Amino acid sequence: PIEFIFEAKQAVIEQREVGVDTKTYARGLRGALRQLPHVIFVGEMRDLTSMSMALSAAETGNLVISTMATQSAAQTVTRIIDSFPPHQQPQIRAQLALTLRAVVSQLLLPRQDGRGRVAAREFMFVNQAIQNLIRDDKVHQITNVIATSLRDDMLSMDDAITELVDKGLVSYETAHPLFHDTEKRASLQKRVFRAAPLAGEGGSR
């Protein structure tokens, strides 16, 4: 179902609901491509067909924006590639390396003060290094590239979570199982427990 109705202000926006305006995601995408759009938003890439159509649309020069139920940029890339049969995966890696521009991943974590949740976000912008990793089937190294690419405005999930803990928004107990880099987790643990007041400090001896 359509969850948000976008108001057309400086552009023509057409929204299609699966089951009402089109029978499937694939048919909806094919119909959209015939209208020569500038931007295509796919609510969620659920299956091989929708992923294949989205990649094909991106290859023709369209900006394609979509969502997936993943927790990191590397996991997103892996999910797309692994959705295809093994004999197609080299081709998909090549397509993805050429067309993917960015991945924003989000985790909603419980706030330390109990007032709802706060978002930790990872930002990956595809540069030459990440293109090569995708093409060469070395997706597992993407997280390390993100962590060392601050000049390219990237931010790893580990660093995003660390910022939330340092600001007092998320507890270390909530954060520590989510870390990819064990050294960063250990460094954060030392800071957190060094900053905490010692039991009985300042009392009589």
Q: Whereabouts are the PLM-identified features?
A:
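Short, flexible helix-loop junctions that flank or precede catalytic/ligand sites
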Residues: 1-205
